C-alpha cells in the first residue's frame, strides 16, 4: 500500500518519542501490505477497528497510540487522517 501523509506521523513521533518504534513498524507493515478488503486488514492487525467510509483505527504499542486512516483499496492508498496518544 502507498502510505499518504507521512509528515504528520513524523511530527507525532517528534512530539511523542516513545511512539517511534511502534509508528515506524506500523508504517513498514502498511507499505508492504496489499489490502483488497477490510478483512485483509483484520487478518494482519486483529485489533484494528473497521469503521464506516473506509476508515480504520489501528491501535499501536498496546493501545497507547492510535492511528486513524482512510483506505482506498482499489488504488492501494492509505491516507492518515488522525493520530492520538491515549
Language-model regions, residue ranges each:
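Basic, Lys/Arg-enriched alpha-helical interface segments
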Residues: 1-64, 73-77
Amino acid at each position: 500500500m502507498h502510505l499518504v501523509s507521512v509528515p504528520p506521523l513524523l511530527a507525532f513521533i517528534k512530539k511523542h518519542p516513545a511512539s517511534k518504534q511502534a509508528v515506524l513498524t506500523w508504517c513498514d507493515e502498511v507499505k508492504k501490505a496489499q489490502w483488497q478488503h477490510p478483512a485483509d486488514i483484520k487478518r494482519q492487525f486483529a485489533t484494528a477497528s473497521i469503521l464506516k467510509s473506509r476508515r480504520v483505527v489501528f491501535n499501536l504499542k498496546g493501545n497507547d497510540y492510535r492511528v486513524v486512516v482512510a483506505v482506498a483499496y482499489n488504488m492501494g492508498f492509505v491516507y492518515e487522517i488522525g493520530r492520538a496518544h491515549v
